[in-house]
Protein backbone atom coordinates (compact mmCIF):
# COMPACT_ATOMS: atom_id res chain seq x y z
CA UNK A 1 0.00 0.00 0.00
CA UNK A 2 1.27 3.44 -0.87
CA UNK A 3 -0.05 6.49 0.90
CA UNK A 4 -0.07 9.40 -1.49
CA UNK A 5 -1.92 10.86 -4.44
CA UNK A 6 -0.78 10.65 -8.02
CA UNK A 7 -2.03 14.05 -9.15
CA UNK A 8 -2.41 16.12 -5.99
CA UNK A 9 -1.20 16.43 -2.43
CA UNK A 10 -3.24 15.91 0.68
CA UNK A 11 -2.22 17.74 3.80
CA UNK A 12 -2.24 15.73 7.04
CA UNK A 13 -1.08 17.24 10.34
CA UNK A 14 1.71 19.35 8.88
CA UNK A 15 3.15 17.00 6.26
CA UNK A 16 2.35 16.15 2.69
CA UNK A 17 1.58 12.66 1.45
CA UNK A 18 1.61 11.67 -2.18
CA UNK A 19 0.09 8.51 -3.58
CA UNK A 20 2.47 7.28 -6.24
CA UNK A 21 1.41 4.49 -8.52
CA UNK A 22 3.98 2.43 -10.37
CA UNK A 23 6.90 3.42 -8.17
CA UNK A 24 6.80 7.21 -8.47
CA UNK A 25 9.48 9.24 -6.78
CA UNK A 26 9.10 10.09 -3.11
CA UNK A 27 11.37 11.50 -0.46
CA UNK A 28 10.94 8.84 2.23
CA UNK A 29 9.85 5.23 2.15
CA UNK A 30 9.16 3.01 5.13
CA UNK A 31 6.85 0.27 6.37
CA UNK A 32 4.15 0.60 9.01
CA UNK A 33 2.72 -2.76 10.10
CA UNK A 34 4.06 -4.36 6.90
CA UNK A 35 2.42 -1.77 4.62
CA UNK A 36 4.71 0.34 2.45
CA UNK A 37 4.37 4.12 2.74
CA UNK A 38 6.02 6.66 0.47
CA UNK A 39 6.02 10.16 1.91
CA UNK A 40 7.11 13.48 0.48
CA UNK A 41 7.71 16.19 3.03
CA UNK A 42 8.47 15.80 6.68
CA UNK A 43 6.73 15.93 10.02
CA UNK A 44 6.58 14.08 13.29
CA UNK A 45 6.03 10.33 13.23
CA UNK A 46 3.31 10.30 15.92
CA UNK A 47 0.62 12.31 14.05
CA UNK A 48 1.42 10.38 10.88
CA UNK A 49 0.79 7.06 12.63
CA UNK A 50 -2.43 8.27 14.27
CA UNK A 51 -3.94 10.42 11.50
CA UNK A 52 -2.78 8.72 8.32
CA UNK A 53 -2.19 5.11 9.33
CA UNK A 54 -5.06 5.14 11.86
CA UNK A 55 -2.89 3.47 14.51
CA UNK A 56 -4.79 4.62 17.58
CA UNK A 57 -2.77 2.46 19.97
CA UNK A 58 0.02 5.03 19.61
CA UNK A 59 -0.99 7.58 22.26
CA UNK A 60 0.06 11.23 22.59
CA UNK A 61 0.65 11.58 26.29
CA UNK A 62 3.25 14.33 26.46
CA UNK A 63 4.63 15.15 22.97
CA UNK A 64 8.13 15.43 24.43
CA UNK A 65 9.39 11.89 24.96
CA UNK A 66 8.78 11.73 28.70
CA UNK A 67 5.88 9.29 29.22
CA UNK A 68 6.28 6.36 26.80
CA UNK A 69 2.63 6.04 25.73
CA UNK A 70 3.68 6.49 22.10
CA UNK A 71 6.19 3.61 21.93
CA UNK A 72 6.47 1.71 18.65
CA UNK A 73 9.00 -0.85 17.47
CA UNK A 74 11.35 0.51 14.81
CA UNK A 75 13.34 -2.33 13.28
CA UNK A 76 12.54 -4.31 16.42
CA UNK A 77 13.71 -1.65 18.90
CA UNK A 78 11.30 0.28 21.14
CA UNK A 79 11.23 3.97 20.23
CA UNK A 80 9.00 6.86 21.26
CA UNK A 81 7.03 8.06 18.22
CA UNK A 82 6.58 11.65 19.44
CA UNK A 83 10.24 12.54 18.88
CA UNK A 84 11.43 11.25 15.47
CA UNK A 85 10.49 12.76 12.14
CA UNK A 86 9.33 10.88 9.07
CA UNK A 87 12.69 11.48 7.40
CA UNK A 88 14.34 9.52 10.22
CA UNK A 89 12.15 6.52 9.33
CA UNK A 90 13.38 6.27 5.74
CA UNK A 91 14.13 2.62 4.94
CA UNK A 92 12.89 1.38 8.30
CA UNK A 93 10.07 -0.85 9.52
CA UNK A 94 7.63 0.38 12.18
CA UNK A 95 5.37 -1.92 14.19
CA UNK A 96 2.43 -0.80 16.34
CA UNK A 97 0.05 -2.91 18.41
CA UNK A 98 -2.30 -2.90 15.40
CA UNK A 99 0.36 -4.84 13.49
CA UNK A 100 0.62 -7.68 16.02
CA UNK A 101 -0.60 -11.12 15.01
CA UNK A 102 -3.86 -12.32 16.54
CA UNK A 103 -1.87 -14.74 18.72
CA UNK A 104 0.33 -11.92 20.03
CA UNK A 105 -2.69 -9.75 20.79
CA UNK A 106 -4.30 -12.62 22.70
CA UNK A 107 -1.09 -13.40 24.61
CA UNK A 108 -0.51 -9.83 25.79
CA UNK A 109 -4.20 -9.21 26.54
CA UNK A 110 -4.32 -12.37 28.65
CA UNK A 111 -1.04 -11.69 30.47
CA UNK A 112 -1.82 -8.08 31.33
CA UNK A 113 -5.41 -8.86 32.40
CA UNK A 114 -4.45 -11.95 34.42
CA UNK A 115 -1.73 -10.04 36.28
CA UNK A 116 -4.10 -7.16 37.03
CA UNK A 117 -1.73 -4.81 35.22
CA UNK A 118 -4.40 -2.62 33.61
CA UNK A 119 -6.38 0.13 35.28
CA UNK A 120 -7.02 3.17 33.09
CA UNK A 121 -5.17 1.50 30.19
CA UNK A 122 -3.59 4.63 28.71
CA UNK A 123 -0.01 3.39 29.20
CA UNK A 124 -0.67 -0.21 28.18
CA UNK A 125 0.05 -0.04 24.41
CA UNK A 126 3.48 1.47 25.16
CA UNK A 127 4.12 -1.12 27.86
CA UNK A 128 3.09 -3.94 25.51
CA UNK A 129 5.32 -2.63 22.71
CA UNK A 130 8.31 -2.55 25.08
CA UNK A 131 7.38 -6.03 26.32
CA UNK A 132 7.33 -7.41 22.78
CA UNK A 133 10.64 -5.70 22.00
CA UNK A 134 12.18 -7.36 25.05
CA UNK A 135 10.66 -10.82 24.58
CA UNK A 136 11.55 -10.97 20.89
CA UNK A 137 15.22 -10.62 21.87
CA UNK A 138 15.12 -12.39 25.24
CA UNK A 139 12.25 -14.85 25.78
CA UNK A 140 13.21 -15.50 29.42
CA UNK A 141 14.16 -12.13 30.95
CA UNK A 142 15.09 -11.52 34.55
CA UNK A 143 13.14 -9.06 36.70
CA UNK A 144 15.96 -6.52 36.27
CA UNK A 145 15.87 -6.91 32.48
CA UNK A 146 12.11 -6.36 32.52
CA UNK A 147 12.50 -3.23 34.64
CA UNK A 148 15.14 -1.94 32.24
CA UNK A 149 12.92 -2.57 29.20
CA UNK A 150 10.00 -0.71 30.82
CA UNK A 151 12.07 2.13 32.28
CA UNK A 152 10.87 4.73 29.76
CA UNK A 153 7.15 4.15 30.42
CA UNK A 154 5.14 5.98 33.03
CA UNK A 155 2.09 4.40 34.68
CA UNK A 156 0.13 6.59 37.08
CA UNK A 157 -2.38 3.91 38.14
CA UNK A 158 -1.06 0.44 38.91
CA UNK A 159 2.55 1.06 39.66
CA UNK A 160 4.98 -1.33 38.07
CA UNK A 161 4.88 -4.59 40.01
CA UNK A 162 1.76 -5.91 38.28
CA UNK A 163 3.04 -4.76 34.89
CA UNK A 164 6.32 -6.59 35.49
CA UNK A 165 4.30 -9.65 36.57
CA UNK A 166 2.42 -9.42 33.25
CA UNK A 167 5.68 -9.39 31.30
CA UNK A 168 6.85 -12.50 33.18
CA UNK A 169 3.52 -14.17 32.43
CA UNK A 170 3.79 -13.29 28.73
CA UNK A 171 7.30 -14.77 28.63
Language-model-detected regions and their locations in the chain:
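Signature of N-terminal electron-transfer/Fe-S-associated modules in redox systems
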Residues: 18-171
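Short, Lys/Arg-enriched N-terminal segments with co-localized hydrophobic residues
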Residues: 4, 9-26
Amino acid sequence: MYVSMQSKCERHSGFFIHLHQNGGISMYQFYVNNELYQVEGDGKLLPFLRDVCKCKSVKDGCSEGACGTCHVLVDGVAMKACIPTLSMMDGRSILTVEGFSDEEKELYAYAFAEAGAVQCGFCIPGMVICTKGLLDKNPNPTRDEIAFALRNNICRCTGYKKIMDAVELAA
